[in-house]
Amino acid sequence: MGPVRLGTLLFILTVYGAWAGTPKEEEDDTERLPSKCEVCKLLSLELQEELSRTGRSREVLELGQVLDTGKRKRHIPYSVSETRLEEALENLCERILDYSVHAERKGSLRYAKGQSQTMATLKGLVQKGVKVDLGIPLELWDEPSVEVTFLKKQCETMLEQFEDVVGDWYFHHQEQPLQHFLCEGHVLPASETACLQETWTGKEKITDGQEKTEEEEQDQEEEEMTNTPVHSQHDPEDL
């Protein structure tokens, strides 16, 4: 049986715009960089998730020193402290490296944590003894892709640029979702906010209007890849 080439993956690659926010034709989504909307969306999701994790802490912080001034230390609940925000922001963009490119999904949904369906399919083929040639060693398959590395760098840039806005939200506007306050209110023009409305349902639509689970699609992809060896010049990091 011949090696499975990247061309077979074109059956499951989808379409979306590039960093400038300008939509492209559907044929062009196999190789692209994340949009500004996608960067802001993931930054907001990661920060709110981390703050949600620490929000129920009953710890009380003591601030200031008594010494000879006669002033008492201030007691501030950790849940509303600047310390909590600083700790949530620490290594925030590093956590973006936990994401993978799920090329079988549309738009901003292609960026999600965990192994992509496509990569799971390819590893399943390898376990079955099929020779899969991605042009890189097997041990490098799980390294962060160019897209994810770009996401992380742009996250750092955006966080530095809008640090004061994030602080304003934390101390004064937490009744609003951060995604709305930061991305829609400060980072993006109204014409570039479409990705914020995209949500993942866990199911994919197929042509006859029925729905297919990821497990069913993975089995079908393995069968297609096994039976249809094709050559391609596409970057393996799109997986």
Curated annotation (Swiss-Prot):
Belongs to the canopy family. Disulfide bonds join C37-C195, C40-C183, C93-C155. Residues 1-20 form the signal peptide. Keywords: Disulfide bond, Secreted, Signal. It comes from Bos taurus. One of its GO terms (cellular component) is extracellular region. Residues 201-212 have a biased composition (Basic and acidic residues). Residues 213-225 have a biased composition (Acidic residues). Residues 199-239 are annotated as: Disordered. Its main location: secreted. It comes from the Eukaryota. Plays a role in the regulation of the cell surface expression of TLR4. PANTHER family: CTG4A-RELATED, PROTEIN CANOPY HOMOLOG 4. This is Protein canopy homolog 4. It is found in: Secreted. InterPro entries: DUF3456 (IPR021852). Interacts with TLR4. GO terms for molecular function: signaling receptor binding. Coiled coil: none annotated.
